[in-house]
């Protein structure tokens, strides 16, 4: 018996096209939509002439002058970028890293025990329902203003999506595979490496992406508070107090670009570890 290759029906998406060409077409389509939106923004801003709605070209030029016109030995970063962008990214990276590590470890421990999961689930659902910015005043009282308060706010807000998704992913491990692992006498570490983690990875990355967004939001929110000395959020409030609308818009565009780049990088890691066929939808 010979195997027959399945041919996509005529007119179906991707029929007769290489996967690479389809991916290129999708990328071009996404970028064309973005370019069209920027062009409409530019034309509308020029036509309206409002100081509150500057053209994107002016915003981009101001952002380059403000943050990316430094010397080559500093990777073209200005003192303003080193003093505000890098501290924000450092706090966000620390908070997200702690939240991810704690969430994955606790999630696997909770998810592998039905009894522990049943006991902890109400607490987890309650904690997840609390709006993250509402936690910031609590940490201001406990830790006062400063970097420890900002990192703690990020950690306690970003840990829940990772923890809950990891626990649910660990629970979804095929029981038959667990039984086979017991027959083969795999050690707990081998079960974790070869059974539980591969099964939970799609859910883990779904939680990581939610936590990454929350980390960015809490990073900015905690920097908007009085007593903050640097950061992108500080740049926003300082520019607003001086009615420097170009800097306000530049900071907003910078935050959007950072969020997109970080999410794209995490998606690339997910595809590498999980496989194209098991990635979570964007």
What do the predicted segments below correspond to?
Residues 82-90, 117, 124-127, 144, ...:
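Alpha-helical membrane-interface segments at transmembrane helix boundaries
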Residues 125-161, 168-169:
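Generic hydrophobic transmembrane alpha-helix motif, especially the helices
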Residues 162-204, 236:
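Short cytoplasmic-facing helical segments at TM-TM junctions of multi-pass membrane proteins
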Residues 141, 170, 217-255, 274, ...:
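Glycine-rich helix-loop "coupling/hinge" segments at transmembrane-helix boundaries
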Residues 1-35, 264-282:
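Transmembrane alpha-helical segments of polytopic membrane transport and secretion proteins
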Residues 152, 156, 188-221, 249-250, ...:
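Transmembrane alpha-helices
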Residues 47-97:
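Periplasmic/extracellular loop-to-transmembrane helix junction in inner-membrane transport proteins
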Residues 94-124:
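Transmembrane-helix boundary motif in ABC transporter permease subunits
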